[in-house]
Every structure is written in structure tokens, then in C-alpha cells.
Regions:
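C-terminal/domain-edge helix-coil "capping" segments
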Residues: 23-34, 95-99, 114, 123-128, ...
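N-terminal segment of the mature soluble domain
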Residues: 30-34, 39-110, 138-145, 182
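Compositionally biased, intrinsically disordered low-complexity regions
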Residues: 7, 20, 85-86
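Short amphipathic beta-strand and strand-loop transition segments with alternating hydrophobic
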Residues: 109-119
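Amphipathic alpha-helical segments in well-structured domains
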Residues: 56, 128-129
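Bacterial N-terminal signal peptides
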Residues: 10-21
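Bacterial N-terminal signal peptides that target proteins for export
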Residues: 1-11
Length: 189
């Protein structure tokens, strides 16, 4: 009886090792979809705050490895002048026609909302980051998902200065976390 248990356990381990050894082959066999990630900063805060770098860093973590990422620098420069979040889908797709991607993730940072309150010894700053997200199936010219997200961050101090740029980065990171989760849920493999 003990011998039968031992043999079945060894066979089970052998099957498990064989299965785990071939898992990477299944992943490699899947054709990766190509994704164009476009981040458009329309916040009006300028380049000095590195908001675009932060956005790319956070969002690329969600898609790297699962998708083939298409270089988006040219597309971002082309779309940087105006807001395209409310634009009709055919117009936006015509702007991005030359880029070889199956899906487009269009993320637009809308203007921050800032509220300050202070008295003689206390200073409070509240910053809200608003982000518009569009996920587009470029191959079928269809919008998969569209939503606006926001994140509010507050900071208090007994000094008269709370950095606006640090508050902008904090609120942006909060909103980008939510956007990243939405991308994970709605972007097809």
C-alpha cells in the first residue's frame, strides 16, 4: 500500500514538473497584440514637473511584457497641441493612422484643480488630478472603453509653503493607479 502511494506521488510530481517546464512555451506561442500608449498632458503645468515621465513609468508597467509596445513619441508630439479626449473616434484614428498598433491607449491629463486654505499658522492645499482614458481597437475602428478618473490629495503644514509640484505628482500617481487598473481590466490580450 505504501509503495502504491509512493509511486503515485512520484508520477504526480513528474507530471507537475513537465507541466511547469512547458508553461513558458504556451506564453511564447501567444501572438502579442501591439499597443500604442499615448499620454497627452493638457494640464498646463509645463514640462518641469516630469508629469509625462511619471505617467509613462506607471502605465508602461501595466502593458510591458503582455503587449508589444509601439513607440509613441511622434504621436504624442503630434497630439500635444490640443485636447483629443472629446474628439470623435474617426478623427482621432486618422491622426494615428500611420502607427502599426492593434490597440490605442489614449490617456489625457486634464487641468488640475487646486484649492488652498490658510490662516496665520496653518496652510492646507488640496489638489485634484483629472485623467481621461480611452481604449480603442484600432484594427476594428471601435472604442472599447472611455472614462474620466480623478484623485484628490491633501497636504497640511504649519509653514506657508506646500509645494504645488509635489501635490500635482501625488494626485497624478493616485489617478494613474486607477487608470492602470482600468487598462488591465478592459484591454484585451
Amino acid at each position: 500500500m505504501k509503495r502504491a502511494r509512493y509511486i503515485s506521488m512520484v508520477l504526480g510530481m513528474l507530471l507537475l514538473v513537465t507541466f511547469l517546464a512547458n508553461c513558458h512555451l504556451v506564453e511564447a506561442a501567444r501572438d502579442k497584440s501591439s499597443v500604442l500608449l499615448v499620454f497627452n498632458d493638457q494640464s498646463g503645468r509645463g514640462k518641469e514637473e516630469r508629469l509625462s515621465e511619471i505617467a509613462h513609468e506607471v502605465l508602461n508597467r501595466k502593458i510591458n511584457g503582455l503587449y508589444e509596445v509601439v513607440d509613441s513619441k511622434q504621436a504624442e508630439m503630434r497630439l500635444a497641441e490640443d485636447s483629443h479626449y472629446e474628439e470623435d473616434l474617426p478623427v482621432l484614428l486618422s491622426e494615428l493612422e500611420e502607427y502599426p498598433a492593434t490597440y490605442v491607449i489614449y490617456v489625457e491629463l486634464l487641468p488640475f484643480k487646486q484649492v488652498e486654505g490658510f490662516n496665520i499658522i496653518w496652510h492646507r492645499k488640496k489638489m485634484t488630478a483629472n485623467i481621461g482614458l480611452r481604449i480603442i481597437d484600432k484594427k476594428n475602428s471601435k472604442e472599447i472603453f472611455r472614462q474620466e478618473y480623478n484623485a484628490v490629495r491633501e497636504d497640511d503644514t504649519d509653514y506657508f509653503f506646500v509645494g504645488s509640484s509635489s501635490m500635482a505628482r501625488k494626485s497624478l500617481k493616485g489617478a494613474l493607479f486607477t487608470v492602470g487598473e482600468a487598462i488591465s481590466v478592459h484591454l484585451p490580450l
